[in-house]
């Protein structure tokens, strides 16, 4: 590991106690192999870090769906890393820390808004898919979509019960967001925005039946989209996220913080929009305080004028170029019937990395 990254990582780990105070550290279950077999080891609920009492009760009462919860968080993290692969902050995780994103999510930034939304959406998605696959006895197919068929098709297969997946995500992910402060309000809003995206993208999926693929009759069921579509949608919401301001109100239970759109001339955010109220760091240089790893040695696109281009990604520091040889399949030929044969070629590429 590069010395500057090693020093940063040590800073993040040693400063972890400060980070954990308001952090959903139960996300770390996505990185633990032990949680894939929760159904056969009920005592592991107590070993999941960061669970509040309500989450612990949920885990023990619905132990068989906890592997899906873990899989959903993992799915959300992977999608975050895909969506931000060309950004200065690329959704880096720290395997040896309970705060798996480091201090980055300590602030109420756009990045924090996106991660909460995609993680909550991931939990809803994975639980819904698991139920449709029959891996749990407490859920199954959606029984609501069995009404009159449409023209040329009939109901069949297993419609995915996204309402149940959303309910699980809401009960589990929102359990810790019960404080009367602005950060809890922000997290709950963005969690719900992620889950709403799942419901909004449900669609009919059909299979044709008939002689020679004539599709005389179609069997259809209610299905979730590919999770990539959810990530793409939420990434657009990240780019257009609404900046908020914090307001304090005196209520019977004490002071309560709420959020209000900062700019009254703009359309106020809906339940489908992401919200934030603190500015992001520029992520150009390593900084243990903000959790930034910097962009040194990151691969950049020399032909792009976007954020993944060498000018912006490297923050004006310039870039290095090296050549790299790669083995690739080439001159492929299709043989009847039915296989493809290829030769192996060596191709040379220019690789550009930030200084």
Curated annotation (Swiss-Prot):
User: Cross-referenced CDD domains, in alphabetical order?
Assistant: Wnt_Wnt3_Wnt3a (cd19335)
Query: Which Cys residues form disulphide pairs?
Result: 80-91, 131-139, 141-158, 206-220, 208-215, 284-315, 300-310, 314-354, 330-345, 332-342, 337-338
GO MF annotations for this entry? cytokine activity; frizzled binding; protein domain specific binding; receptor ligand activity
Q: Which residues are glycosylated?
A: 90, 301
What is the predominant subcellular site recorded for this chain?
Answer: secreted
User: What are the lipidation residues for O-palmitoleoyl serine?
Assistant: 212
Q: Report the Pfam families cross-referenced here.
A: wnt
Residues in the signal sequence: 1-21
Q: How is it modified after translation?
A: Palmitoleoylation is required for efficient binding to frizzled receptors. Depalmitoleoylation leads to Wnt signaling pathway inhibition.
> What is the annotated localization of this protein?
Secreted, Extracellular space, Extracellular matrix; Secreted
- Which biological process annotations from GO are given for this protein? anterior/posterior axis specification; axon guidance; canonical Wnt signaling pathway; cell fate commitment; cell morphogenesis; cellular response to retinoic acid; dorsal/ventral axis specification; embryonic forelimb morphogenesis
**Highest taxon in the source lineage:** Eukaryota
Which UniProt keywords are listed?
Developmental protein, Disulfide bond, Extracellular matrix, Glycoprotein, Lipoprotein, Proto-oncogene, Secreted, Signal, Wnt signaling pathway
Under the subunit heading, UniProt states:
Forms a soluble 1:1 complex with AFM; this prevents oligomerization and is required for prolonged biological activity. The complex with AFM may represent the physiological form in body fluids. Interacts with PORCN. Interacts with WLS.
Q: What is this protein called?
A: Proto-oncogene Wnt-3
């Amino acid at each position: 590991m590069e010395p500057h990254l090693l020093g940063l990582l040590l800073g993040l780990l040693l400063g972890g106690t400060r980070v954990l105070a308001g952090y959903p550290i139960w996300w770390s279950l996505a990185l633990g192999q032990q949680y894939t077999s929760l159904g056969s080891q009920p005592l592991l609920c107590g070993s999941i870090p960061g669970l509040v009492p309500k989450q612990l009760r949920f885990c023990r009462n619905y132990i068989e769906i906890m592997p899906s919860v873990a899989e959903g968080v993992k799915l959300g993290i992977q999608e975050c890393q895909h969506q931000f692969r060309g950004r200065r902050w690329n959704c880096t995780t720290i395997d040896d820390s309970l705060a798996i994103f480091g201090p980055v999510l300590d602030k109420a930034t756009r990045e924090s808004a996106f991660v909460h939304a995609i993680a909550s959406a991931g939990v809803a998605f994975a639980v819904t898919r698991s139920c449709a696959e029959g891996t749990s006895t407490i859920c199954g197919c959606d029984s609501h979509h069995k009404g009159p068929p449409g023209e040329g098709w009939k109901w069949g297969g297993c419609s995915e019960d996204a309402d149940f997946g959303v309910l699980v995500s809401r009960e589990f992910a929102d359990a810790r967001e019960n404080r009367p402060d602005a950060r809890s309000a922000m997290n709950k809003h963005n969690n719900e925005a992620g889950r709403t995206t799942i419901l909004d993208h449900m669609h009919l999926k059909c299979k044709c039946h008939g002689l020679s693929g004539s599709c005389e009759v179609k069997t259809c069921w209610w299905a979730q989209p590919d999770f990539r579509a959810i990530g793409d949608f939420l990434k657009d919401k990240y780019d257009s996220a609404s900046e908020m301001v914090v307001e304090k109100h005196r209520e019977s239970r004490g002071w309560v913080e709420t959020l209000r759109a900062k700019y009254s001339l703009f359309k106020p955010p809906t339940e489908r929009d992401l919200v934030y109220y603190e500015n992001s760091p520029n992520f150009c240089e390593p900084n243990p305080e903000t959790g930034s790893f910097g962009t040194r040695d990151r691969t950049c696109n020399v032909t792009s004028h976007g954020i993944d281009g060498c000018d912006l990604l490297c923050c004006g520091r310039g870039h290095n170029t090296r050549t790299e040889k790669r083995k690739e399949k080439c001159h492929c030929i299709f043989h009847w019937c039915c296989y493809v044969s290829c030769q192996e070629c060596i191709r040379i590429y220019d690789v550009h990395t930030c200084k």
